[in-house]
């Protein structure tokens, strides 16, 4: 018996002020992001999805709903705090300011903000929860880029660090970082051991 968990990054966000939105409320999907989510849903339409978990943030909730609407059989939508965006001090900073930092979220932080190890612990706790709730099934979990990035590094036995996050191409992530509405799929055996990982971006399909 194997359990499959597909981590899906939310679609592209409407962000006219060009800020790092992080956990800020009211940031929903752009039209392109909705199309990306629909493409992911169509890709998963016949995958026998048993449930769609999602971060409580609006962009993830909207992505989950659009995916669910494409499935050939209904699947419950379940909000889960373990999937929410990283807790950092940079919410609301401009994209320009973040680019000057080289998007370094972790080099100068202290509690209560999250470290990569904290974030990975959340992802692994979610994996354990999902396997217990839906053993032998396939579920989708809509989350955020760094959570998915650290899960990928874990799958390849690499350290969860900000530096390692920049080397995801070595883990099969052709986009260098989990693309909007991309799928990172993890398959576990009955004992919870990871037996397969794959990355795919449905809206890139021709």
Label every PLM stretch briefly.
Residues 2, 73, 78, 85-97, ...:
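Acidic, low-complexity terminal tails and accessory targeting/binding regions
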């Amino acid at each position: 018996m194997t359990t499959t968990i597909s981590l899906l990054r939310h679609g592209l966000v409407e962000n006219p002020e060009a800020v790092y939105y992080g956990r800020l409320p009211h940031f929903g999907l752009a039209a392109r992001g909705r199309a990306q989510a629909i493409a992911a849903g169509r890709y998963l339409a016949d995958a026998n999805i048993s449930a769609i978990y999602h971060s409580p943030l609006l962009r993830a909730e909207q992505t989950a709903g659009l995916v669910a609407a494409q499935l050939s059989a209904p699947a419950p939508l379940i909000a889960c705090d373990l999937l929410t965006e990283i807790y950092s001090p940079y919410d609301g900073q401009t994209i320009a300011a973040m680019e000057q930092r080289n998007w370094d979220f972790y080099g100068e932080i202290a509690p209560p903000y999250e470290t990569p190890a904290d974030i990975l612990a959340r992802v692994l706790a979610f994996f354990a929860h999902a396997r217990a709730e839906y053993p032998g099934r396939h579920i989708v979990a809509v989350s955020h880029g760094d959570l998915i990035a650290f899960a990928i590094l874990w799958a390849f036995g690499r350290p969860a660090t900000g530096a390692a996050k920049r080397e995801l191409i070595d883990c099969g992530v052709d986009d260098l970082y989990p693309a909007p509405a991309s799928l990172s799929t993890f398959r576990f055996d009955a004992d919870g051991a990871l037996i397969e990982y794959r990355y795919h971006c449905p809206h890139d399909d021709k």
